[in-house]
Amino acid sequence: MHVRIVFYLLPASGKTTREEVYTYSYDYADRVSKVEHTLGGSKITLYDCDYGKFRRLYTKLLHGSATNKQSYTYNVCSWLTGISGTRFTQNLYYNTGVGTAKYNGSISSMTWKSGNESTVRGYKFTYDGLDRVLNATYGETASISTNANRFSENVTGYDKNGNIKGLQRYGQLSSTSYGLIDNLTLTLNGNQLSCVEDAVSTAAYGTNTAFVNGASVAGEYAYDANGNLTKDL
């Protein structure tokens, strides 16, 4: 194990200069195993983890508190199958679960639960012949069947470069109803997005993240010579 220490001085006019220190500890494989933060002589552990004998992340402790501990599980292929903790739990299924079995590492279904929630939420995934996602079908409970399709997403087409040409998204329409919030058509110039049109006009409700179409012109997005986005109408 070796350690790297980074110092910062925090000067401010009329104030006492304070010293801030980050201490990084590494294991035998040169992976970060612990990060400690010291400010004004007070030290806390930001990150403390264990990789285990198979070199996979098994546990992660945040802010030095067992309350913020996360544990990770894997299958025999070393694919991540679960994250468990007091604040977040997630399960990933490949050739098991309620989705269509996948044996190539693609996820067939997933479930998760946040904090003290009692509701288990999840998605089932389907893929095309090139193993690109076509449908992410939402549901609740372990069977991913209750309140089906409330937040589903469907890719309606890809171009020859593998870029998405169409996307349908479902979400909350009112306090009691759910439905289609986006029906997007994406136009590209090569691999650069140039225009997005939405066939559905739905105002955001609650945490609804419906697409907002700011303009309907051919060149809604523009880029510089390096491909960085410079305009979004």
What do these predicted regions represent?
Residues 1-233:
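Acidic/glycine-rich beta-solenoid
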